[in-house]
Each structure stands twice: as C-alpha cells, then as structure tokens.
Regions:
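Short, flexible segments with low predicted structural confidence
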Residues: 28-32, 101-102, 141, 148
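Hydrophobic ligand-binding cavity/cleft-lining segments
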Residues: 3-83
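General secondary-structure edge motif
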Residues: 38-39, 83, 110, 145, ...
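Amphipathic, hydrophobic N-terminal targeting peptides for secretion and organelle import
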Residues: 1-9, 196-202
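Beta-strand/loop substructures that line and gate deep hydrophobic ligand-binding cavities in soluble
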Residues: 3-5, 116-171, 176-178, 187
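Phosphate-binding glycine-rich loops and adjacent basic patches that engage nucleotide phosphates
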Residues: 17-26, 88-93, 129-142
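Phenylalanine-focused residue identity feature
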Residues: 23, 59, 95, 114, ...
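Glycine-rich portal/gate segments that line the openings of hydrophobic small-molecule binding cavities
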Residues: 42, 50-52, 63-125, 138, ...
C-alpha cells in the first residue's frame, strides 16, 4: 500500500474515532450542543400509575432527593430550597452513565417540574403530577425532548432516545410506588399497634 493510501486510511480511522467519541460524550451528557439545527420535538408519556399511599407521602418521596433528604441516591443536589432546586441526575444506560443537570420546581403536594440545563439532549421539559383518589394517589408523568440534526435527530429520538428515556422513567415510577406503599403500610401498622396499646391502657 502506497504512502498516500496509508495516510488516508489513518485519517479516516481518526475521523471515525472522533465521531464515535463525540457521540458517546453527547450520550453521556459530557458534551452539550444546543445548535437548534433541524430540531425535532418528541413527546414523552403520558405514563400513569396508581399508588396505594396518600398523596402527601408520595410527594415527599418524589421530592426528597431535591430537598437533601435522600441518601444513596443517583442524584446530586447542587443548589436549592423548598421550592426550587438544581440537581445532576446520573442514569445508567447500557454500558455508560448519562449525566443530566436540571432545574426542579417543587409545588407541593401536586406537582414536580423539570427543566433541562445540560445533558444528552439540548431540550427537555418534564412534569410529575399527583392526584388524590380517595386517600390513594395517581402519579402521572409527561414531557418532551428536543433533538437537533434533522433526519438523524428524528430517527435517534424515535428509536433510541425516547424509548431509553421512558424506560428510565418507568423504573423511577416503580421505585416511587414501591417505597411509598412500603412506608404507608408501615405507618398503618404503627397506627394500629398504637391504637391497641391505647385500648389496653384504657
């Protein structure tokens, strides 16, 4: 193989490595591009689940990481107060972890909103709403993501980003449901035990 072909092959390989590396950096949220070129918007959800726990308790579990009240979480609280927070989310996606930084609006006990700052996509808005249903809770999620680069962005959003995103949301909702129902059941057991003690003392 002649020298020009060797150089061309080396440059082609280098370009491929750079493209793959840039894609991974974007997917991991380490490289943020907000160009607005050919942006397509993709709806997320709605996803709704029923939780056998009071709305106030469910809201406490959803909001806890953004109030500095959850240990061992994959969420880093960067700043905030009782109504507004900035946090970094670390989400496992196959062989890598995606990092997203968002502004979180806390409106107890009925709403938690998210507005994207940096991460794998240039635009994302999400919302959890909590409705009281006779002492239980309906937790509803919906939102949208925007992805640039025309047809490539539309294909990536439809076949990769949105399915992965919604899969992560469903895992989170399942975790909230499990935690809320366990806490509600524990509180109910303690309440019954206290009632029995009061009856025995009387």
């Amino acid at each position: 193989m002649s020298a020009p072909w060797i150089i061309a092959a080396a440059l082609g390989l280098l370009l491929l490595v750079l493209v793959v590396g840039a894609f991974l950096m974007l997917a991991m949220g380490r490289l943020h591009l907000d160009l607005g070129w050919g942006r397509s918007v993709h709806q997320l959800g709605p996803i709704t689940i029923g939780i056998e726990a009071p709305r106030k308790l469910v809201f406490e579990i959803v909001a806890a990481p953004y109030l500095g009240r959850a240990s061992g979480s994959d969420i880093d609280l960067l700043a905030g107060d009782e109504r507004l927070a900035v946090a970094a989310h670390h989400t496992k996606v196959h062989f890598y972890t995606a990092r997203t930084v968002e502004v979180i609006e806390l409106d107890p006990p009925g709403r938690v909103g998210f507005r994207h700052i940096t991460g794998p996509v240039p635009h994302a808005v999400e919302e959890f709403t909590l409705s009281d249903l006779d002492g239980e809770t309906e937790l509803r999620y919906e939102g949208e993501i925007g992805i640039d680069f025309f047809v490539l962005g539309r294909l990536a959003g439809r076949h990769w980003v949105r399915p992965q995103w919604e899969r992560g949301v469903r895992r989170h909702l399942d975790s909230v449901k499990r935690g809320a129902e366990e806490r509600a059941a524990s509180q109910e057991r303690r309440s019954r035990a206290g009632g029995r003690r009061d009856s025995a003392a009387g």
